[in-house]
Amino acid sequence: MTLNMMLDNAVPEAIAGALTQQHPGLFFTMVEQASVAISLTDARANITYANPAFCRQTGYSLAQLLNQNPRLLASSQTPREIYQEMWQTLLQRQPWRGQLINQARDGGLYLVDIDITPVLNPQGELEHYLAMQRDISVSYTLEQRLRNHMTLMEAVLNNIPAAVVVVDEQDRVVMDNLAYKTFCADCGGKELLVELQVSPRKMGPGAEQILPVVVRGAVRWLSVTCWALPGVSEEASRYFVDSAPARTLMVIADCTQQRQQQEQGRLDRLKQQMTAGKLLAAIRESLDAALIQLNCPINMLAAARRLNGEGSGNVALDAAWREGEEAMARLQRCRPSLELESNAVWPLQPFFDDLYALYRTRFDDRARLQVDMASPHLVGFGQRTQLLACLSLWLDRTLALAAELPSVPLEIELYAEEDEGWLSLYLNDNVPLLQVRYAHSPDALNSPGKGMELRLIQTLVAYHRGAIELASRPQGGTSLVLRFPLFNTLTGGEQ
């Protein structure tokens, strides 16, 4: 019988018989040289054969194993219920597969994955039990180590305050920690990365962005940082190709408090700059008033000198006139410059945002500030801080006057528009104009700028070559209009 004939018949018994006839001892040689531990017992579970791999695994020689029950290898580490299940299955003449903790001759314990099959004769009677087992101690140790590492990593990730997420090449989340899940829940169940509108593919490795997101109705600022992770394919078809599309690790930290502190620091510096500008404007206005007052007697002295004749020899008159002129010159030199920063073009929306942030705490249920613009793209030109000081002076004055009228809730409307190259700011309120013009501030003598807000506003507006209008509103209240040129060309300078 040839091998082709055996394949045509396709009968396992015939194939085995033919191979045995053509190659006597083939199956014995295969079992002897197999790397899998194989043992054979009789129907009473006494060992009748064990291959060399079995002997190496257990530490016993074949002579020591023959006629021994496999319980020789049993250890107390295997639960009794496992053995009960095994024998219940085998007595039903069904194969059983499971894991056992065996004990080698030297006392060492090892974990085996074992298959036991009842062997029946042609009459269906049980003759043998065939067992094949593999030592899986090393693979089990590695598996448990990996599981422990994963558990430890998950515990660490879930206990750090930052949100950690891993995304694939399509920006799909493949792993995240508890903090990220919490962020998503606070966003109403929406994906945080979608709400942030951030894509790691558009961010370079190690790049960081600070982005706002609305969480439970409040704006939070989150720092997003990305790192590329090398990918290893999990598909069996790519066993020989150790590569896969790269993934990206993203760490998202809440930096709202830090940003608020930075913003508060910036606002504090802005307040200091505005205060310095107001103080310089107050000093300049006071010196200008002094110059005007001093100019009258000096003019009178000059007229007296002309009447007496400049060469009349009136030493006292000449000395008084010269002292007056020198005093005027000294005062002129003492007038501080209002050039605190360079003229520039800047967007108006952040300008109003700063104004609102500076006065947010001073407006309550009885005081309302409404800001509108004709276009969100409006810009201003000049010294930004000084123009902000103009509005601040007016708000300070209006709030102080409104405090003297507690029966009337304060309403302030600020509107901005561009008109033929001029920026017009309309400040309307419900404080009577008479109150604005003639109100006296008790702090005028001990606080710079108190009680002279309108004069300081005029000084700053004039310095920017602007215009100011103050009038009563038909429906009651006061309307202040400030106009500033948007380019130097309107005032004779360069654009």
From Swiss-Prot:
Coiled-coil parts of chain: none
Cofactor annotation: FAD
Alphabetical keyword list: FAD, Flavoprotein, Nitrogen fixation, Repeat, Transcription, Transcription regulation, Two-component regulatory system
Domain PAS: 23-93, 151-174
GO biological process, one term: regulation of DNA-templated transcription
CDD domains membership: PAS
UniProt domain PAC: residue ranges: 94-148
Cystine bridges: none
Residue stretches spanning the membrane: none
Family matches, as Pfam families: PAS (PF00989)
NCBIfam families from the UniProt entry: nifL_nitrog, sensory_box
Task of the protein: Required for the inhibition of NifA activity in response to oxygen and low level of fixed nitrogen.
Official protein name in the record: Nitrogen fixation regulatory protein
Organism of origin: Klebsiella pneumoniae
Organism classification: Bacteria, Pseudomonadati, Pseudomonadota, Gammaproteobacteria, Enterobacterales
